[in-house]
Amino acid sequence: MDSEIPNEAFLIKITYCEKNMEILPAVEKEFPNGKEVKASIIWLHGLGADGNDFAPIVPQINLSFDFGVRFIFPHAPSIPVTINNGYVMPAWYDIKQMDVDRHVDIEQLQESASWVHKLIDREISRGIPSNKIIVAGFSQGGAVSFEAALTYSQPLAGIMALSTYFATSETIKINMINKSIPVLICHGSLDPVVPESLGKKSLSTLESLGFDVRYHSYPVDHSVCPQEIEDIGEWISKILGDS
């Protein structure tokens, strides 16, 4: 599908900020190119990947509004991961056990969420209103997205959680300013890495807390499919068009 999109349709930037500023390096895409950027989507990758993982699907997302969106795909730091025998790889936090309860390093996850807060702060400083910023993530990145968005101090546009789980549901201190934030959860019914039961558990937890959640299930494994990309585009168009 990428080949059908002219190269000039989107602008790609790679940003590397000073480490002492505690801003994560990231790949950026402004789409469609030439339109004034009025919204941002911060999209976190999964375990072992990097910010380039989801950047290629940007031209496939059909957005129905007449302004540009800045997609920001940060790179996770490389750390030892217990479930992979301590192998050092890009990860937002350590996973200690792959059982149904997902024993993870909560402090590392919260630290990653604080890095996302700084990316949000930077987008606001670039002129994007907080309620035009979506926080998204796949797998590990989705778990961080829940924590980052629900604890942020200003109202955000939404949370997009793909093939993930709500790792900090029992410890999170939700900022009431984002108590009604819209949430999109997408999950593969054949996912062997993050079973769909964890996606449904996130759904029930958030609904019990009063959140507006849209849930989609697809007959795929731990991946994103074309129908999911279409649903993502529709949801983003509604959320950013209404916010």
Regions found by a protein language model. Give the residues of each.
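Serine-hydrolase catalytic machinery in alpha/beta-hydrolase-like enzymes
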Residues: 20-131
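Short beta-strand/loop motif that positions the catalytic acidic residue
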Residues: 185-187, 191
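Conserved alpha/beta-hydrolase "nucleophile elbow" surrounding the catalytic nucleophile
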Residues: 45-47, 133-138, 188
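Short, proline-enriched alpha-helix->beta-strand connector loops that line the catalytic pocket
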Residues: 178-183, 211
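Primarily recognizes the serine-hydrolase "nucleophile elbow" in alpha/beta-hydrolase
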Residues: 124, 131-178
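A domain-start/cap signature at the N-terminus of enzymes
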Residues: 2-41, 52, 201-204, 213, ...
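Short, conserved loop/helix-junction motifs that constitute active-site signature segments
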Residues: 63-66, 175-180
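C-terminal catalytic histidine-bearing segment of alpha/beta-hydrolase fold enzymes
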Residues: 197-243
